Amino acid sequence: ITKEYVLVDGTEMEVDYPVEGRFQYTRYAGTGGLAVGRRMGVRRLAFASRLKEPWRVAYSRALRPDTRVMLHRNVLERARRLAPFLKFDPDPFLVVGEDSGKLWWIIDLYTTTDHYPYSAPLVPRDADGARIRDLGGPNHDEPDLRRLNYIRNSAVAVVDAYNGDVRFYSTDEDDPLLAAYRSHFPELFSPIETMPDELRSHLRYPDYMLWAQASVYATYHVQDPVIFITGGDAWKLPRELFHSDELQPMMPYYTVMDMPGEGGPEFVSVIPFAPPATTKRLTAWL
């Protein structure tokens, strides 16, 4: 339903939730949306044309001049329209503010290029040595990482789930690409230190970023130059059956694990490495 627009604060109350066979009603109390204007006014007619709903919008008596229309309600689409030069993690996650009790969407953002000097392109391979053509087929919606030779998780976006307000925070002040974007849009990004603590405590290591790093580390973990050149100790990324009958590249996943030498259980992102098909030895987890 987030692909559709909604009209709020009209003459009719909005259905909230049922209680004992009866509906509770409410009225939107947020600040999101754009006022539609008076009936048959230029502003109202413009919205009716834009939404392709002439009768519902232009002539409806259920709308008031201060009734608002909320557009671009999908959080990824909403944030991407403000910063189309960044790559967006396809898995935004919803958190509850510990102090405010409000709901927020957090999206990890990446700066990428395929023109970084002296950096090899990312060409991941699976356990059989074949190049991975996608990042998971229909069950993953990740942007194409292939051939990129630079990626950093340099920013995050926070979207107010009620009002739709979007805020961008820079998490890597040393990233040259983000520095270039900030020079052109100086008011778009805020320092990560200004993010409220109730949101900052929910930040996690992106599994999309770990997947890219694991793809590179599978080759470059080798320290012996001879073995590195021959590729005899190269690790591979495994495949798995996930929501289909076809093998797909395995993505990192989050779990709670008690790591050796640590003080207790931790929330971590992990991905296994598989040996080449010609060997039978266990490799490693990252």
Label each region the model flagged.
Residues I1-L286:
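Soluble extracytoplasmic regions of secretory-pathway and membrane proteins
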